[in-house]
A protein has these predicted regions:
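Carboxylate-rich, polar loop motifs that coordinate divalent cations or form catalytic acidic clusters
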Residues: 1-249
């Protein structure tokens, strides 16, 4: 029997956090914690908090730029996606965030931003999905086949993705610069707003968190929906993840 103790520390504006509203938290390769707030980016090194403004063409942007999503890539790089189609990269050499991409369409409204395992940042709009490759800086625009606001994306393997909207979740394949929807029994007939997704590769199951209908799982092998015995009422499920590494159960 092994037991592990855990230490928790509360961090607030009184400790230097720029805003109480936190959109996302990531940990980089140095162990620093990054916080995406309503005012920009904060970095916590275990002792002090440093605030970062975002830079566009050598000009500091105001906090009213509608930031949305924060990701750390496999090499520890930090990326920020804005709701108006901007992408910012943390430059470790200069200790700053610089804009590396801006959507040419001023009207582009991003409902969800995502970083996949293929180094693509997804900027999901209602009519189209823009892919920005962090290695090559190449940009690709795909039609949004779901024709609805995308709420979450979850990668299953190198080419397959689950894409959720306010009306359900679909299984897709991205290959040869094209995205196509793959029909799945039962899952295609779920009509509810999806807030969160987690795919368990060993179990081959997709775990789904909804806005007001609790959680359920979809078994890819049996093509069955598995509902939890625990009733969560009208609790909105915003995030699902595995608490066990290399879990087989």
């Amino acid at each position: 029997l092994m037991a592990y103790g855990q230490t928790y520390k509360h961090i607030g504006v009184e400790d230097g956090l720029s805003n109480r509203r936190i959109y996302n938290i990531q940990k980089d390769h140095q162990g620093y914690m990054w916080f995406l707030t309503n005012e920009g980016m904060d970095r916590y090194n275990g002792k002090d908090i440093k605030h970062y403004k975002l830079i566009e063409e050598n000009k500091q942007l105001s906090s009213e730029i509608h930031l949305g999503w924060l990701y750390a890539d496999k090499e520890g790089g930090i990326w920020v996606i804005g709701k108006k189609g901007r992408i910012f990269q943390y430059e470790e050499k200069y200790d700053r965030f610089t804009m590396v991409y801006k959507s040419p369409k001023v009207t582009d409204a991003i409902s969800y931003g995502y970083l996949d395992r293929n180094n693509n940042l997804w900027l999901c709009g209602k009519d189209s999905i823009l892919l920005y490759n962090t290695k090559t800086t190449q940009v690709m625009r795909l039609p949004n086949l779901l024709e609805d606001n995308i709420t979450v994306v979850e990668q299953a393997d190198d080419t397959h993705f689950f894409i959720a909207t306010e009306m359900g979740v679909r299984y897709t394949q991205f290959e040869n610069e094209a995205l196509k929807v793959i029909p799945l029994d039962m899952l295609d007939h779920v009509y509810t707003q999806i807030n969160s997704l987690y795919f368990h590769p060993q179990l081959h199951r997709l775990f789904v968190g909804t806005f007001s209908d609790g959680t359920f799982a979809y078994d890819m092998s049996a093509h069955q929906i598995i509902k939890s015995d625990t009733k969560l009422g009208d609790v909105s499920i915003t995030h699902i993840n595995s608490s066990l590494k290399n879990s087989q159960a």
